[in-house]
Amino acid sequence: MTHARQDIREQVATTLRTEFANVYTSRAKVLFEQDMPAVLVYTTTETIQKERWDTDGFGNLFRDLEIAIEAVDIGKDDLDDKLDAMAETIEGLLDGWEMPNMKNAILRFKSTETDMSIDGNKIYGAIKLTFTITYQTETHNEH
């Protein structure tokens, strides 16, 4: 059985693959020029909403999980525009998104960050879109 975080990453990646050829569910993917443009889907921070616990401590856990979707490409002076176009596509694909096996999960767009790096005559850029998904998992009631 896989953890819900893995299921969420896989479902988001499946949705993104409808528009992007190179989508990976890890931030540890080594990318080469032939992999560009690429999209990385990974999770960062997860917190539990303690105030929603049942009084006996065995109710469903309400989890807030941050999902990073990082679009990476190579370009010249058009790189900002290329990254913004990728971000717009990602936002459109995830607007109103529902996870097939977790209909109670709520996905919210949180933030965007960009970064660029120059290596010789190549400019590498990334735009990271962070989403928060709130979902529930059951605990085992010992009573």
Give the positions of each predicted feature.
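Charged, amphipathic alpha-helical segments and their flanking helix caps
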Residues: 1-35, 45-143
